[in-house]
Every structure is written in C-alpha cells, then in structure tokens.
C-alpha cells in the first residue's frame, strides 16, 4: 500500500516523520512518502501571532504547499519531501530539554474567563476540568497544543506571562473541532 506521512510545523518538523516511519516499519510496513507543510507557529510563549498580514501570508503559503502535497499523494509519488528536518539525536535531546514546557502549572486563567467550558471540551488529552465555572488543569502535563488558549473567546488563558501580547490563532479552514 501507498503509506504517506505529513508533518505540519511552524519552525521545524524536527524528526517526527522519522519517528513515525520507524514505528510503521517495525510493524512490517514501509513508508512510501514523507511530507512537511510549513504553517503558522501557534506556540505563542515564543511566537507572536498579532500581525495579521504576516499570518495571512503564511497561510497562503501553507495552502499552496497543501495543494502540492495533495497532487503528489494523488500520483502516489514516493520520496522524502520533508523540509527543515533535524537529525534524530538533536530531537531526542530537545525532547528531554522541553519536558518541563509541558507542565500544566505554566497555564493560568484570569478574571476575563466567563466559564463557557470550551477549553475543557476541546482539550485533546482531557487535562482540564471546570470547577466553580473556571478551568482547572487536572493533569500535571499535557501535550501543550495550546488549543485552550487559542480557542478561549475572552483570551483568558495564558502561558505564564509570555502570551498576553502574542495573540491567538484559529485556522481559517477549520470550522469544527470534532
């Protein structure tokens, strides 16, 4: 079968296609193609998403890359098309260093919270509960996708004191989180 992998990334896809290819190959299958698509980096503790023009340009670039990837997949084109990948040993080290970034103690909610529960509903790892109509992180770690921060209608969820001025991002092509 034609098995393909796609890594979306903001600054680097790291070695994620390599990790996944190793897993698939350990199950007796081969990976036909690997792709990467540069997208808006939503890690707002570092990246600023407040410049709409810059975000729109990057989204247009992403849309073109998605079209190119779709064409290659439709033709079942084999190959490694991953750009900006990092060596496995670098990613292994980086993963150990960044473990502390996944601590939910970095996340906090301010008084703008209206208790809508969207953060809890949208958390992919069920790390958030609502207590007295406010989010409380019930796991010590999460995947730190920051979906809670980006979806909050009042921008009441922050990562330490690093995200207040960096904005929120919702992909314009996604209308449902189901």
Feature roles, as predicted:
Residues 108-109, 114, 118-137, 147-164:
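Iron-sulfur cluster-binding cysteine motifs and their immediate structural context
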């Amino acid at each position: 079968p034609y098995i393909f992998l796609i890594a979306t990334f903001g600054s680097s896809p790291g070695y994620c296609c390599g990790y996944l290819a190793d897993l698939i190959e350990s199950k007796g299958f081969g990976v036909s193609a690997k792709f990467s698509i540069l997208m808006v980096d939503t890690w707002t503790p570092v990246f600023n998403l407040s410049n709409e023009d810059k975000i729109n340009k990057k989204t247009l670039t992403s849309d073109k890359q998605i079209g190119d990837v779709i064409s290659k997949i439709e033709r079942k084109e084999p190959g490694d098309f991953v750009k900006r990948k990092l060596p496995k040993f670098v990613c292994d080290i980086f993963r150990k260093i960044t473990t502390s970034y996944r601590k939910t103690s970095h996340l906090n909610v301010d008084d703008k919270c209206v208790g809508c529960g969207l953060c809890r509903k949208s958390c992919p790892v069920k790390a958030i509960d609502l207590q007295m109509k406010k989010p409380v992180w019930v796991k010590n770690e999460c995947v730190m996708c920051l979906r809670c921060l980006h979806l909050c209608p009042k921008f009441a969820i922050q990562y330490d004191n690093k995200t207040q001025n960096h904005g929120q991002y919702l992909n314009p092509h996604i209308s449902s989180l189901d």
